[in-house]
A protein has these predicted regions:
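Short, surface-exposed, charged amphipathic helix/loop patches that serve as local interaction elements
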Residues: 29-136
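Short, intrinsically disordered N-terminal pre-domain segments
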Residues: 1-13
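Short acidic, Pro/Gly- and aromatic-enriched capping/linker segments at domain boundaries
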Residues: 11-24
Length: 136
């Protein structure tokens, strides 16, 4: 018999996965550069997604009452992508910029996910891969 606790993707997703960053061009491992990330099924990410959907639905209702459609600029879409990636970051190691080590703070996470879209893409892709968060 299988115990459902062994299939709890929400808990496993919040525990995290150590993502080994890859070079954006040649896909070689960037030695020492790792980001611990939450999975898409984690409670934290699910709560973020619910909040985002509720906000967008509310905005859409208000605009609909004014006979307007909900649209987004490229900057708004990028900001949403950055926020969605940032909520998945738990911690990191080996991340530096300009010769200085970057501590894993909310400000630095937002900065890195904004400036280095390839890192943001890797975080999102690894977060979506359920195998990375398979409960033991």
């Amino acid at each position: 018999m299988i115990d459902l606790n062994n299939l709890d993707l929400a808990t496993a997703g919040d525990s995290g996965f150590d993502l080994q960053l890859l070079h954006p061009v040649d896909k070689s491992e960037l030695e020492g550069m790792k980001i611990r990330i939450r999975g898409d099924k984690s409670k934290t990410v699910a709560a973020f997604d619910r909040k985002r959907i509720n906000e967008l639905q509310q905005k859409e209702r208000v605009l609909k009452g004014k006979n307007k459609e909900l649209t987004f600029t490229t900057d708004e879409l990028e900001k949403m992508a950055v926020e969605a990636a940032a909520v998945r970051v738990i911690s990191w190691q080996g991340i530096s910029e300009g010769g200085m080590v970057l501590d894993c703070t909310p400000e630095n996470i937002t900065h890195v996910m904004t400036k280095y879209s390839w890192m943001r893409d890797q975080v999102r892709e690894a977060s979506e891969e359920l195998e990375n968060f398979r409960p033991d």
